[in-house]
Swiss-Prot record:
Pfam families: Cytidylate_kin. This is Cytidylate kinase. GO terms for molecular function: ATP binding; CMP kinase activity; dCMP kinase activity. It catalyses: CMP + ATP = CDP + ADP; dCMP + ATP = dCDP + ADP. ATP binds at residues 12-20. NCBIfam families: cmk. It is found in: Cytoplasm. GO terms for cellular component: cytosol. Keywords: ATP-binding, Cytoplasm, Kinase, Nucleotide-binding, Transferase. It comes from Photobacterium profundum (strain SS9). It comes from the Bacteria. One of its GO terms (biological process) is nucleobase-containing small molecule interconversion. The gene is cmk. Its EC number is 2.7.4.25. InterPro entries: Cytidylate_kin, Cytidylate_kinase_dom, P-loop_NTPase.
Amino acid sequence: MSTHAPVITVDGPSGAGKGTLCMLLAEKLGWHLLDSGAIYRVLALAAIHHGVDLESEDVLVPLAAHLDVQFKAEGDLVKVILEGEDVSGELRKEETGMTASKVAALPRVREALLRRQRAFSNAPGLVADGRDMGTVVFPNAIVKIFLDASAEERANRRMNQLQQKGLDVNFGSLLSEIQERDDRDRNRSVAPLRPAEDALVLDSTDMSIEQVTAQAFAYIEQALEQKS
């Protein structure tokens, strides 16, 4: 991991707006982008492409350590490039998700992916999106942000997204799913979801993405000025 490239971490629960904020910050700063939530799916896809044994840590660890992946912000989307190929669509397939769950359960694979994520820290800088970026992966990040929103607001945003795709969804079911995931993430024994002690906590419940980005960027500019 580069010791000179500055890192900005954005952690928080699902649906708080981390992905959009990170993409906008990376574009504004001209920095690299890491979507840590996609990294296990990327590894799963690489394993499927290479036809390797999904239960063999001896095979998966070197694959994880040398994972050739890039995250590129384009418009309002993040493109995921695996070994030179845009795999953004494939990442969303059910098979990829199921395989990701299997490989994520292997301790040595998790350790290899932790090191691989840290290797994203290259000049001019990195914006890292996740749940434990500021607490575990990049504890020395120059700026740490914890982006939150009420479960009800996050369920409402998700419902609007799905309805725009023409899907019929139930608000109560979405809210229950989000609350259950929050409970799992906040109470897990390894890297529970929580703000780093030195993180700026932003509650986006009653804020637009423009307001969130403006507040985050003002904080980042101040931190970068103090560091220079």
